[in-house]
From Swiss-Prot:
Disulfide bonds join C6-C31. GO terms for molecular function: ion channel inhibitor activity; toxin activity. GO terms for cellular component: extracellular region; nematocyst. The keyword Secreted applies. It is found in: Secreted; Nematocyst. Keywords: Disulfide bond, Ion channel impairing toxin, Nematocyst, Secreted, Toxin. This is Toxin Bcg III 28.78. Belongs to the sea anemone type 3 (BDS) potassium channel toxin family. InterPro entries: BDS_K_chnl_tox, Myo_ane_neurotoxin_sf. Signal peptide: none annotated.
Length: 37
């Protein structure tokens, strides 16, 4: 997994089934929002 921002929402997301963040926005696969990360 790779910590990065998903969509236009603020905060850090963890990709459980994807390597990297496409274009720095948007996401595919499992993306869970983690508070405090």
């Amino acid at each position: 997994g790779v910590p990065c921002k998903c969509g236009s929402k603020k905060g850090v997301y963890w990709f459980g089934q994807i390597t990297g963040c496409p274009g720095g926005h948007g996401y595919k696969g499992s993306c869970n929002y983690l508070l405090g990360k």
